[in-house]
Structure formats: structure tokens, C-alpha cells
């Protein structure tokens, strides 16, 4: 095991231990939760190393980066999570690689995703903006 991979394994293990501790404190089991490893600005080779360490859920918040990485890593058993604001015009493309989209914030985006041809249904999570900051993503609570 390389030094960098050892460090990566140690960091992943520390995160998993923290999740297990928090789950226990909340009266839950860690295996009830899903760890989504976000690899923003890191190469696809890092995702490949993470899979070797047992990671299967990967998150990205930039469409182009997610699209490229998912295309490069089709040989791996991964679940791709899109966690960034998604432009309606890119929704159909995202639907081709994303297993889950965590930033649904408007009806037009739902319609665009619904019209995409996908082999597996996409898990969709509505993002709500609870702040007064219009620059933040998410639907208004009244919507």
C-alpha cells in the first residue's frame, strides 16, 4: 500500500469512525447511513483508489466534472450523487450518470429530469433555501 493510499485509508477510516460515533449517539446504526465521498477537483484515479477502500457512493457538484469522471469509471460499481445546483439545460445529461440528485429546487428541473430516458430511476432530493440569501441554492419554503 502506497504512502498516499495509506493516508487516504487513514482519513477515510477517521471519517467512518466519526460517523459511527455520531450514529451511536443518535441511537442509530452506522450501516443505516450512506457516506457520500465528494471528490471535487480530484482526479478519477482517486475515485478508483477509494473504491479499493470500499467506497461506492461518490458526489460531485460540477456537472462537467461528474460527467467526465463517471464516463471514465464505468467499469466500477459506483453510485453517482449530483450535489450542486443543476442547470435545467444540463438535466438530461446529468440523468445519464447520476443515481441521485440532491439539489432539486424548481419544477422546471423536475420536468427536465422526468423527460430524460434513464435505465434506473433517479433518487431526487428537494433542496430548500432556509436563508434570506437569494444567492444560495434551493427552493423557497413557500414553493
Where are these predicted regions, by residue range?
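Conserved alpha/beta-domain cores
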Residues: 1-143
